[in-house]
């Protein structure tokens, strides 16, 4: 399952949206930085497709976390519930609709919130993310997260309108 999901995310190159108005589309891989302790160095693949303004936004997100050996560590899919776009930065919040975590069998994060922010910097995109589970703080509707990690592979396209 992991390889096909990852291939689909990387193939998504951030092409233009068919809808008008604010949007973010694309996919890419980040490498978890040192602040993630034992998970540092793991690749995480993000796909984000959203359009609209505020809580009238619609879209989907897909996150795949692989371990350092390339095995599937976690996978989450959900719906975007809010989108804010300012210049080349898009902040989306969403709700997890399906998830699987290797180290937490039986735990349910379905219904919990996610915040993802993308800075579209051409070939040097950056990403920030926060997941509302495993002791992390609650995510407010339409929250944003400072992009803190470079996108190593892939591309996101942010459109302000």
Residue ranges and their predicted role:
Residues 1-7:
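Sec-dependent N-terminal signal peptides
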Residues 7-26:
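C-terminal region of N-terminal signal peptides and the immediate post-cleavage residues
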Residues 36-115:
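Predominantly extracellular/secreted and cell-surface proteins with exposed
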């Amino acid at each position: 399952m992991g390889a096909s999901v990852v291939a689909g995310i990387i193939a998504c190159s951030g092409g233009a949206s068919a809808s008008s108005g604010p949007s973010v589309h694309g996919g890419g891989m980040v490498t978890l930085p040192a602040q993630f302790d034992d998970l540092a160095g793991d690749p995480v693949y993000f796909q984000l497709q959203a359009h609209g303004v505020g809580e009238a936004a619609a879209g989907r997100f897909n996150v795949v976390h692989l371990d350092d050996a390339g095995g599937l560590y976690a996978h989450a899919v959900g719906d975007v519930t809010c989108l804010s776009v300012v210049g080349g930065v898009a902040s989306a919040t969403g709700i997890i609709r399906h998830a699987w975590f290797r180290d937490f069998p039986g735990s349910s994060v379905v219904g919990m919130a996610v915040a993802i922010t993308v800075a579209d910097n051409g070939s040097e995109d950056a990403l920030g993310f926060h997941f509302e589970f495993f002791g992390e703080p609650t995510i407010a509707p339409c929250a944003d997260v400072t992009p803190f990690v470079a996108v190593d592979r892939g591309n996101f396209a942010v459109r302000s309108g």
